Amino acid sequence: MTSARALVSPDRELVPVASAGYVGELDGIRAVAVSLVVVAHYGLGFIVPGAFGVTLFFFLSGYLITTLFFAEYAAATAISVRRFYLRRWLRLTPPLLVFILLATVFHSVSRTSVGGDAVPVGTTLAALLYYTNYYDLFWNIAADKIIPFGICWSLAVEEHFYLLWPWVLRAGIRHTRSVFWAIVAVCAAVLAWRLIARYGLGLSSDYTYMATECRIDSILYGALLRLLFETQWAPAVVRFLRTPTCRIVAGLLLLATFVIRDEGFRQTVRYSIQGIALMPIFTAVLVDDPRSLLRRVLSSAPAVLLGRLSYSIYLLHLLARTPGEVVFGGPYRAGSIISGLLFVLTAAYLIHVLIERPMARLRRRLHEHADAGRPIGAALSRVTGNQQAYGSASIGIVTGDQ
């Protein structure tokens, strides 16, 4: 049995610690992910792997959420599921409401929606209630298909993960190895189901790409990496993941998932290979020397800012092309692309300043109020204080930004 509180020992100096510190490189990863998605959707999808950007978001989400829970447990020997859901709601919902409002206005004014000049109720509810992936797969008819809302499918997958994962960790956080092997089994089962869906049932590539039961492993691979860091195997695992051979193999595996165009491979094995290959890459971001080129690029001011804006950029980038499509006569005209990028960056920054920052402060106040009078201050100081010993290996979450 591995306790989440057993975080420090002399041979664990390279193992990332679950703490409340901020790590700019993770915003840099968000910047890479959203850039891949936007560039692909703005006309270069034939050479830029936009879908991999979503996979990056998934992996990062699994890692960060799991780290948050271990940090909370290390500080208070408890996990508050209620507070977690409240923080998630305050983080995700306000920008989503702005997106839905803007989509309604844009499509009503420009009359670009299919079959009408307003956003249909069905697709709006699907976005608000986080089931866009299934709505688009099974219920979305042509007259009800508003393209910008389709982007919410990945939010639905993450929300479904949030519904289950806090309860799993709260029940099993003192039995990390057991949880780890259970999640390995789930990842294997998800791959098996994709193979059955593709080769046995002949289901569409959209199903294996968007359905929660086909993509949740992309989030779980990130959670697995955090779970590995909480086991007694952690020092050996980190040493292995840092070896040049491991990193080269991981890079080649990722490259293979981009260049192999067989549709069966892309619908099934691709996601599993990417999840495994991301583990050495994320480890490099977490434990390498901060002066390394990778970490300096990811922690640069432009990358961090873009990462902080990434959620709103992701939501708005397709919608942002709408005015340009009307004015310039198509989605991939230079004017449409330039105006779309200017709009999405401006809107995302305004949402960040006017909505996301105030919501982040509210989340922190709620967190501090809930902890008032609880004897966790010293424990939290012990956890975050380990950053002096771990240096660049320290990793954690600020619930307002990370």
Positions of the model-derived regions?
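C-terminal "closing" transmembrane helix and its immediate cytosolic amphipathic cap
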Residues: M1-V17, L64, L298-A303, L318-Q402
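Juxtamembrane transmembrane-helix termini
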Residues: T2, D11, V54-L90, P95-S113, ...
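Interfacial loop-to-helix transition and helix-capping segments at the boundaries
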Residues: A20-G24, L44-V54, D117-A126, A142-V157, ...
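Functionally critical transmembrane alpha-helices in membrane proteins and complexes, commonly lining
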Residues: G21-E72, L90-V98, G122, L129-D136, ...
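Aromatic-anchored segments of alpha-helical transmembrane domains
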Residues: S35-Y42, V105, N133, V186-I196, ...
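Transmembrane alpha-helical segments and their boundary/interface "anchor" motifs
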Residues: A71-S108, A118-A126, S154-L163, C214, ...
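Alpha-helical transmembrane segments of multi-pass integral membrane proteins
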Residues: I219, A223-L224, T245-R357
